[in-house]
Amino acid sequence: MINTEDTFYGQQGGEKILYVTRPHPIASAVNMVKVYIIALILFIIFYSLTKEFSGMSTGLYLISIVIPLVVIFLGSKMVKNYQEKNISYITDRRIVRFDPTTFFATNIRTLSWDEAVKVKTFSPNMLWKQLKIGTVILHARTTVKTVDEEVRHTLSADDIELNDIYLYRDLGNYIDKILFTYKQMPKEVADIRPFIEKPKGQRY
C-alpha cells in the first residue's frame, strides 16, 4: 500500500487523519547543496592529483569526473527517496511516522495518545527559526520518570521526532491540544478539526 494524503499503511478502521507532514522542501534543497559541495570537493582533490602524478593523469582525470558524478547521482536519489518516503500522520488515535533508512527499507513508528505525555519544539538555528521551520518531539510515557520531573534531553526509542517541520510551534501547540483533550475529554477528540498549514488566524 502506498501512503497518500488520505490513507496510509496500517491505518485502522475509522481512524481519522488530522494532519499529514513531511520535511519542508527547503531542507531537501539544503541536503542537495551538501551533495554538490561534496562532489565539488572530490573533483578538486582528484583533479589536483593529476598535476602531482603526471604519469597517471589520464586515469586520475577520468576518476575526477566519474566519482563526483556518481556522488551526485546517488546523493540525489537518496535525498529524493528520503523526501518522498519520510511522511508522518497525526490522527485522532496516534501519531505514525514512516522513516526511510535505505532505498528499500522504511521503519514505521507509532505512538498512541494514551502513551504520549509531552511535546517539545525547537529550531536548530536562527535562519530556520525565521523561516518557521523546526523540530517537533513527542515524548512517550517511558521517557519521563514522573509527571513532575524534567524530560531528558536525549530521545528514547519510543519517542517520535519530526524534523524540518513548517510552523513547528503551531503544530506543537496543536498536538498539545490533542493530548489535553484525549486525556481530559476523550469523547471530544472526534470534534477536533484538522490542522491547516497556514499562519495563525488564516486557517479557518
Annotate each PLM feature.
Residues 18-20, 89-91, 96-97, 137-139:
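Soluble periplasmic/extracytoplasmic beta-strand elements of cell-envelope proteins
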Residues 34-42, 63-74:
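Lipid-exposed faces of alpha-helical membrane segments in multi-pass integral membrane proteins
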Residues 130-204:
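A membrane-cytosol interface segment of integral membrane proteins
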Residues 1-53, 186, 190, 197-204:
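N-terminal membrane-targeting/pre-transmembrane regions
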Residues 71-120:
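Conserved beta-hairpin
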Residues 49-68:
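Hydrophobic alpha-helical transmembrane segments
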Residues 8-10, 80, 87, 127-129, ...:
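Short secondary-structure boundary/capping segments
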Residues 102-107, 122-135:
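Short acidic, Gly/Pro-enriched loop/turn segments at secondary-structure junctions
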